[in-house]
Amino acid sequence: MNRVSASADDRAAGARPARDLVRVAFGPGVVALGIIAAVTLLQLLIANSDMTGAWGAIASMWLGVHLVPISIGGRALGVMPLLPVLLMVWATARSTARATSPQSSGLVVRWVVASALGGPLLMAAIALAVIHDASSVVTELQTPSALRAFTSVLVVHSVGAATGVWSRVGRRALAATALPDWLHDSMRAAAAGVLALLGLSGVVTAGSLVVHWATMQELYGITDSIFGQFSLTVLSVLYAPNVIVGTSAIAVGSSAHIGFATFSSFAVLGGDIPALPILAAAPTPPLGPAWVALLIVGASSGVAVGQQCARRALPFVAAMAKLLVAAVAGALVMAVLGYGGGGRLGNFGDVGVDEGALVLGVLFWFTFVGWVTVVIAGGISRRPKRLRPAPPVELDADESSPPVDMFDGAASEQPPASVAEDVPPSHDDIANGLKAPTADDEALPLSDEPPPRAD
């Protein structure tokens, strides 16, 4: 009975990691596929359309969640919403973090990462096959590039898997390498700076929508149906991170563009923009002086980076290196977001931000303002002053002690004179002529004579 229960426990323990790996491989992708299928079928039912090409549309939208451009009727939709992508990265990071523990071995970590990448790649291959099959029925639907599809899926899930695994075993991995210990603090400072920049830019975007409320109502007026207005609201929510990234670019001194329309903190060039309510937040010419104050957002994000770097005081060189690593990491993250949030938008042209100026702007604010914050917050530790050795004390000739023979221990251990005088001579000394004490001598009585009686 005990053997049967032990074998059952072993099988259950072995099945647990297998279930975790399957969940990591297909969990986020299957959940996204289910949501996309429900939304697509609901739209087809509301539009009273047939289900022809429904599976091709579902597969195209699943690839679109991974920033794969969709081509319909010869027109490319390259500007994909960032919100589904960020949710996919978060779901992948969460699943990998749950399957990994701080004590996981390297083999377990490799299996988790391989599962997080292998499952989505398999689903991408199936989606490409479904789209290719549906394109024979729906001629307007075009199969995307396989290389672009696999690359986008791999990058999105790699970012999520790396984030989840790093949150569990990052410190242990750093301790096992020759990299400095403050590298983890630099990553945290970069994350704080990016979140501060995006969060404050989101607040500015919301405030701009309130200011341009009339323009937003006009954009909602392009449709009279409730379902159409609901669809515009959903699209605005999905594309809100794209607009926030554009606002962040403007806040650090870069620019954002929608076709020929260009927006920055110093000038606005007009042009046609899509009728999307979230785009009502874009500034309109002539540009007021309040938009120049948007640069305060970039400075505030630099303060957030400096505060995180100053939590652990380091010497000058190490503190500077930690801040530079955080600034470079934050600039790279913003560049990736700017690249992912842009693309080709049909007849409107290219949509996105000036990525080169965005990287330079983030580096400037994170480094300059961050360094000032580190200095003020006490993030630089001073080296202790070296104590000068005390000068030797010179003794006078009168105060000098006589030399002591350190190697002759018998000289310092001679018995006192009184002890040496009280010791009686031995038989050898008497034989050599040494006179032994007699009873008449004023000395101690001999041991064989009785002591004298007092009269």
From Swiss-Prot:
Localization annotation: Cell membrane
Membrane topology annotation: Multi-pass membrane protein
Stretches that traverse the bilayer: 26-46, 53-73, 77-97, 111-131, 146-166, 191-211, 232-252, 256-276, 278-298, 323-343, 357-377
Stored Pfam families: DUF6350
GO cellular component, one term: plasma membrane
Keywords on record: Cell membrane, Membrane, Transmembrane, Transmembrane helix
Protein name: Uncharacterized protein Mb0980
Annotated InterPro entries: DUF6350 (IPR045931)
Chain positions covered by the region annotation Disordered: 384-455
